[in-house]
Amino acid sequence: MSVIKMTDLDLAGKRVFIRADLNVPVKEGKVTSDARIKATIPTLKLALEKGAKVMVTSHLGRPTEGEFKPEDSLQPVVDYLKGAGFNVRLAQDYLNGVEVNEGEIVVLENVRVNKGEKKNDPELSKKYAALCDVFVMDAFGTAHRAQASTYGVAEFAPVACAGPLLAAELEALGKALKEPQRPMLAIVGGSKVSTKLTVLDSLSKIADQLIVGGGIANTFIAAEGHNVGKSLYEADLIPEAQRLSKVTNIPVPVDVRVGTEFSETALSTEKSVADVSGEESIFDIGDKSAEQLADIIRNAKTILWNGPVGVFEFPNFRKGTEIVSNAIAEATANGAFSIAGGGDTLAAIDLFGIKDKISYISTGGGAFLEFVEGKVLPAVEILEKRANG
């Protein structure tokens, strides 16, 4: 099914309500990481170029519905946009209508302060819809939530469409999952098999090769009968790890880096996976394992990456993730299509300076994983319904 795209619409003189993801970290009234705002700026510029009367909104943090507090305000985002050269102002009371002039952007205050937002209240949804001629959903990061500003408004707005950012996410994920160039490789890291089990299941059916990292890999190591000492792993999920290993090719580390404490000053010792003692914890893969994975990565034509292979935040347990990251960048330079998503993955990409060497970096955490699992994203589903009558 297809969606209407904002890029295809005539927006001249139209009131356009953009639901963006401007949920950025703020300290002492200043934005401390601007990645999400920067990702939204091309959408705002395009709407202005098309002659629209532009309103944009987002959630920020976790406010209590019906109780506005200054720390929940989108004012720091407004200040940032002013600094970027936009004619922009904040509207706090907007549910009964707001005046928007051509050439300006009106930021509508934090949607999660509005009563009924999270429960997708129809009355609130209708109020949002009444503000606009065109609703633009451009927040992939919240597309897995059916809320008034992501789903309800799309039911009632005269026109509901996908913004450039959302459209690009869907296209990139579709390219990786629906028609991947072979061989397709999926890299899934993280602390627990239990939180990624459905992702691993779905990917085992699509990918030619699956790489697991972090605490997930420890469960697979234990499933092979090795001692994992005090490592984070899930004994009750060993049968699941064994089942998945039969379905698809999952390489288990042959060597690891261990420590006796979880800290950046802990002594890091490299050893065979068969030699881990009862007092040690596995915090990274060893050089042999990292190079084996790098070889697999370099031969892949499609790479989906979610999660590191070790505790890369600590310099003493960083090497495995660094080797894997650089191999993904190398494969991409040689023509592979790579897509990365998830907070830890993005932090690793920043740390190793490979942002421009990945084909597509997803802005969604939970939404990215749910899409990979094959779940229907409510905010996308309603756009498809509206586009197809």
Swiss-Prot record:
Binding positions (substrate): 21-23, 36, 59-62, 112, 145
Quaternary assembly: Monomer.
UniProt protein name: Phosphoglycerate kinase
Catalysed conversion reaction: (2R)-3-phosphoglycerate + ATP = (2R)-3-phospho-glyceroyl phosphate + ADP
Keyword Zinc-finger found: no
Entry similarity comment: Belongs to the phosphoglycerate kinase family.
Catalytic activity, EC: 2.7.2.3
